[in-house]
From Swiss-Prot:
Residue ranges, Extracellular side: 124-136, 212-224, 287-391
Chain sites annotated for binding a nucleoside 3',5'-cyclic phosphate: 498-628
Membrane topology value: Multi-pass membrane protein
Cytoplasmic-side positions: 1-102, 158-190, 246-265, 413-717
SUPFAM superfamilies for this protein: cAMP-binding domain-like, Voltage-gated potassium channels
Keyword Transport: yes
Top-level taxon of origin: Eukaryota
Organism of this sequence: Arabidopsis thaliana
Listed name of the protein: Probable cyclic nucleotide-gated ion channel 5
Stored InterPro entries: cNMP-bd_dom (IPR000595), cNMP-bd_dom_sf (IPR018490), Ion_trans_dom (IPR005821), RmlC-like_jellyroll (IPR014710)
Domain IQ per the UniProt entry, residue ranges: 634-663
Compartments where located: Cell membrane
Length: 717
């Protein structure tokens, strides 16, 4: 039999050293079998050949897959990605979220840096020629190159970022595709072209070519190339920023962590648009000035248009033009705001030419002036612009008005949304307070009740700021709720002496079931004789506890409750009693708040559950602690001590009276007839003392009538 058993071989008992591809082959093609494991009669040689066949077959399938170009499609859950050997990033990983935020910032910086290339052309006021600011060209090219490095890093990161398989989005987050080939294919089909066009260093190439050639004829070509290239590259850059921001919101849940950050973000975008508009206005002003100079040069006859660009002073005929250029250009291309009939209508660019910023070498002054012009006209939708009949100028003005309208609406709408989120709770409180006032007025509540309602609403607002803490905590997982409750309540619960010596498991169960309560001044928490439905543990404030022993005449007991004490101890006795029914115990005291009180409440159902689940509450130590801090037990103990003390005083006085009577009788010893008189005097004195203390004895008996509180069923140590 043993030999026959050795001939049985299971498929799943094959060598565990098989590669993962063969295991995947077995799993993928398991449906080809009948679904049940049958014994296979084979020898050891047959089993070894079977192993080799599976290995070769799986390798063959993999090679066929590579030759067909399909790749190996693999998907894992996010938690499995952490133990993967491949460096593939989870799209919701904190590091990747930080990199995406950094990339958004780099995109915004690139959009901010690119308009600096529009400030490169500048007019030389002395030579009356158009040149390029070399220092600014080097600075702008360096900044653009540095920012493009972030683009390249982001492109490399996209090739290592997993994505969620569309077919696995039925439930939960879905499975992550970690196959590098699939990730690269998806990126190449979606965003690679846009990223590639955005990162091309075309402005740097144009600037570096000009800096190396330094020919005057290259100024015009450089100016036109920069205008065209920056405009063209703005399209893919904007197309990349907006989806990336949306993806960041979808992945992280929010784009800005605080409302002020969100408002500042949209304000920054509005200022960025003003910066772009100002740079365009500066460059287009130079274009109009260049067009005027070319017309004046052609009309002069002794001028070549190459003379208008710096670096061409060595050309033939420049000396003749140099003598006449001042008068020709000033008469033909004069820009004056006060001139109602100018020789050349510069339109909206007159302000730039008359202010002299196109010829200023101070970049800070030039930039601030253009930024202010862009911000002013975006905010006013270009209402103060007086355009000429030049088509490009009119198109620029129309674009400015439309862009200003859209951006201003976005700015106001988003800033209002973000800033309203700061005061939404306050507004809700105002609405609730208004509704409460209208309701109290409609129901004609007395003034004292209205004041109590207002005081409670105000105190609750100051404590919670309108946030429903219980609702927030209830939506969290159980272990997270336990940790939060432990963090919030454990230190306060340990201040209650009844819970100070309990173990952590019992304290966690109590903290999970505690509910915060607020009571304003002069609020009655419970009245004597009412059912006790919750046990309160005081955290802050002062309370007054009064009892009349069920309304008995002549009996009044008053005590103060402070931080760390509790009330409603009748409920604990009821919860610990296994024979207690569904009827709640009656309160033996009236508890009133003397100040604003914060407390934790433990309801009857929750206390009964804790008492039934945790035997620690039945220990002798808890019994002694409960008796020591219970005001009901303290009242009983005080009455018991008073009754014992009065009995002691009575007995002592009677003994003193008898001693005095005996002394009198011994001092008056004489004839025999005086013995009977002394006996009668002693008897009369005893009767007198007995009569004097009769009323006092009645009071003592009434005091002792206060019943001892029922003891709970402490069945375990």
């Amino acid at each position: 039999m043993a030999g026959k058993r050795e001939n049985f071989v299971r498929v799943d008992d094959l060598d565990s050293r098989l590669p993962s591809s063969s295991v995947a082959f077995q799993q993928n093609y398991a449906s080809n079998f009948s679904g049940q494991l049958h014994p296979i009669h084979a020898s050891n040689e047959t089993s070894r050949s079977f192993k080799k066949g599976i290995q070769k077959g799986s390798k063959g399938l993999k090679s066929i897959g590579r030759s067909l170009g399909f790749g190996v499609y693999r998907a894992v859950f996010p938690e499995d990605l952490k133990v993967s050997e491949k460096k593939i990033f989870d799209p919701q990983d904190k590091f990747l979220l930080y990199c995406n935020k950094l990339f958004v910032a780099s995109c915004i910086l690139s959009v901010f840096v690119d308009p600096f290339f529009f400030y490169l052309p500048v007019i030389n006021a002395e030579s009356k020629c158009l040149g390029i600011d070399r220092k600014l060209a080097i600075t702008a090219s360096t900044l653009r190159t540095f920012i493009d490095v972030f683009y390249l890093a982001h492109m490399a990161l996209q090739l290592r970022t997993a994505y969620i398989a569309p077919s696995s989005r039925v439930f939960g987050r879905g499975e992550l595709v970690i196959d590098p080939a699939q990730i690269a294919k998806r990126y190449l089909q979606r965003w690679f072209i846009i990223d590639f066009l955005s990162v091309l260093p075309l402005p740097q190439i144009v600037v570096w070519r000009f800096l190396q050639s330094s020919n005057g004829s290259d100024v015009l070509a450089t100016k036109q190339a920069l205008l065209f290239i920056v405009l063209v590259q703005y399209i893919p850059r904007f197309l990349r920023v907006l989806p990336l921001t949306s993806e960041l919101k979808r992945t992280a849940g929010v784009f800005a962590e605080t409302a002020w950050a969100g408002a500042a973000y949209y304000l920054l975008l509005y200022m960025l648009a003003s910066h772009i508009v100002g740079a365009f206005w500066y460059l287009l002003a130079l274009e109009r000035n260049d067009a005027c100079w070319q017309e004046a040069c052609i009309d002069a006859g002794n001028c070549s248009t190459d003379f208008l660009y710096c670096g061409n002073q060595n050309m033939d005929g420049y000396a003749v033009w140099n003598r006449a250029k001042e008068s020709v250009l000033k008469s033909k291309c004069r820009a004056d705001l006060d001139d109602n009939n100018p020789p050349f209508d510069f339109g909206i660019y007159t302000q730039a030419l008359s202010s002299g910023i196109v010829s200023s070498q101070n970049f800070i002054v030039k930039y601030c002036y253009c930024l202010w012009w862009g911000l002013q006209n975006l905010s006013t939708l270009g209402q103060g612009l007086e355009t000429s009949t030049y088509p490009m100028e009119i198109i620029f003005s129309i674009s400015l008005a439309i862009s200003g309208l859209i951006l201003f609406a976005l700015l106001i709408g988003n800033m209002q949304t973000y800033l309203q989120s700061l005061t939404i709770r306050l507004e809700e409180m105002r609405v609730k307070r208004r509704d409460s006032e209208q309701w109290m007025h409609h129901r004609m509540l007395p003034q004292d009740l209205r004041e109590r309602v207002r005081r409670y609403d105000q105190y609750k607002w100051l404590e919670t700021r309108g946030v429903d803490e219980e609702y927030l905590v209830q939506n969290l997982p159980k272990d997270l709720r336990r940790d939060i409750k432990r963090h919030l309540c454990l230190a306060l619960v340990r201040r209650v002496p009844l819970f100070k010596s309990m173990d952590d498991k019992l304290l966690d169960a109590i903290c999970m079931r505690l509910k915060p309560c607020l009571f304003t001044e002069s609020t009655y928490l419970v009245r004597e004789g009412d059912p006790v439905d919750e046990m309160l543990f005081i955290i802050r404030g002062r309370l007054e506890s009064v009892t009349t022993d069920g309304g008995r005449s002549g009996f009044f007991n008053r005590s103060l409750l402070k931080e760390g004490e509790f009330c409603g101890e009748e409920l604990l006795t009821w919860a610990l009693d296994p024979k207690s029914g569904v009827n709640l115990p009656s309160s033996t005291r009236t508890v009133k708040a003397l100040t604003e009180v914060e407390a934790f409440a433990l309801t009857s159902e929750e206390l009964k559950f804790v008492a039934s689940q945790f035997r620690r509450l039945h220990s002798r130590q808890v019994q002694h602690t409960f008796r020591f801090y219970s005001h009901q037990w303290r009242t009983w103990a005080a009455c018991f001590i008073q009754a014992a003390w009065r009995r002691y005083c009575k007995r002592k006085k009677m003994e003193e009276a008898e001693a005095e009577a005996a002394a009198v009788s011994s001092s008056t010893a004489g004839p025999s007839y005086s013995i009977g008189a002394a006996f009668l005097a002693t008897k009369f004195a005893a009767n007198a003392l007995r009569t004097i203390h009769r009323n006092r004895n009645t009071k003592i008996r009434d005091l002792v009538k206060l019943q001892k509180p029922p003891e709970p069923d402490f069945t375990a140590d």
